[in-house]
């Protein structure tokens, strides 16, 4: 019983950089989170927040020449993946942990049929299966994602964008992984197809019992698919909690408020969108204090000088000086952007 309650993935104080002869990019700066078995965690943030770098770190697929994991732990089923050899990682990748990337065309080879590509993934991780068993599995997984098995003899260019993404999802799920990482899986799709793919992912997750890390910038996708949420900004997690915490709690990190402010409201014509002013900080020269301070309308003097501590109660955590009980008692701070 105790093992059932343990997280399938736990990341502790992960730090990742990209290093060249000229500069060091601090991409991920000490993030920690966990994914419970059978649950979906949404990792939300703007482009450049460090979401994809986090995903690539889990699979140890960072660029060999520049990517460096500087510290932390990535524990999958209790085993730190940073301390296993490459041969063991090949058993994990695509078999126990799979990933769906943003652009389906970057994951599909145009000169092979989709059936051959799914079959290659199955044979790599299930060498004991006969050819007939592999073909049967290809048919099953295509049916599972809503594609007629007869189309396994077709090439990627014969599929629409939404169907290509279904093929990629089929490849990711063909070995029934315990964890699926979905990196902006619907970004390249129109709204109607996006809804269909999201509904399919949710159904497959429920049917197969697969845990999932959903990487997105879209809070609407988070609301539809996730159980827990981490909001990421400039390599750090600034807010975390259940999906109810993020959408219903009275208090939020100013960055999370900014994300909500940039979502169109279909219930009224009066409210204008309120985009977050400014740009993500230079990752080679991050601010001394809170990374969001230069863009924050509620910025105080302490925000520019000190990193915020973790605040909040229960499952809802905030990394912001506004909610620091010690600051509220002493009155330290003062708005500097007003």
Region locations from a protein language model:
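Short catalytic/signature loops enriched in Gly
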Residues: 7, 242-338
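Conserved ABC ATPase "signature" region
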Residues: 76-80, 132-150, 257-261
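ABC ATPase NBD coupling module
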Residues: 81-98, 124, 246-250, 281-287
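Conserved ABC ATPase signature
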Residues: 154-159, 163
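A short, proline-enriched helix->beta-strand linker immediately N-terminal to the Walker B motif
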Residues: 174-178
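P-loop NTP-binding/switch modules centered on Walker-like glycine-rich loops
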Residues: 181, 185, 189, 193-271
């Amino acid at each position: 019983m105790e093992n059932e309650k343990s997280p399938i993935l736990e990341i502790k104080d992960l730090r990742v950089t990209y290093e060249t002869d000229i500069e060091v990019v601090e991409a991920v700066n000490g993030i920690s989170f966990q994914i419970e078995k059978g649950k979906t965690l949404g990792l939300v943030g703007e482009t450049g927040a460090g979401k994809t770098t986090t995903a690539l770190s889990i699979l140890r697929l960072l660029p060999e020449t520049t990517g460096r994991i500087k510290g932390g732990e990535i524990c999958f089923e209790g085993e730190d993946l940073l301390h296993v050899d490459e041969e063991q990682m090949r058993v994990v990748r695509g078999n126990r942990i799979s990933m769906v990337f943003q652009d389906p065309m970057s994951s599909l080879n145009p000169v092979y049929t989709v059936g051959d590509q799914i079959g290659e993934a199955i044979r790599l991780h299930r060498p004991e299966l006969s050819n007939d068993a592999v073909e049967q599995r290809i048919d099953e997984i295509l049916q599972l994602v809503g594609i007629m098995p007869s189309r396994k003899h077709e090439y990627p260019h014969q599929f629409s964008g939404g169907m290509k993404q279904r093929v990629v999802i089929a490849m990711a799920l063909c070995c029934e992984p315990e964890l699926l990482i979905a990196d902006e899986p619907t970004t390249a799709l129109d709204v109607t197809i996006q809804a269909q793919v999201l509904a399919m992912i949710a159904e497959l997750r429920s049917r197969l019992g697969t845990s999932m890390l959903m990487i997105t910038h879209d809070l609407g996708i988070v609301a539809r698919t996730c159980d827990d949420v981490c909001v990421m900004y400039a390599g750090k997690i600034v807010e975390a909690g259940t999906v109810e915490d993020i959408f219903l709690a009275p208090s939020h990190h100013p960055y999370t408020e900014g994300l909500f402010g940039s979502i169109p409201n279909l219930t009224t014509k009066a409210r204008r969108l309120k985009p977050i002013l400014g740009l993500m900080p230079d990752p080679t020269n991050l601010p001394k204090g809170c990374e969001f301070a230069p863009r924050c309308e509620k910025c105080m003097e302490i925000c520019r000088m000190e990193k915020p501590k973790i605040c909040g109660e229960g499952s809802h955590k905030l990394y912001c000086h506004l909610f620091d009980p010690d600051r509220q008692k002493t009155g330290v701070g003062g708005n500097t952007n007003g």
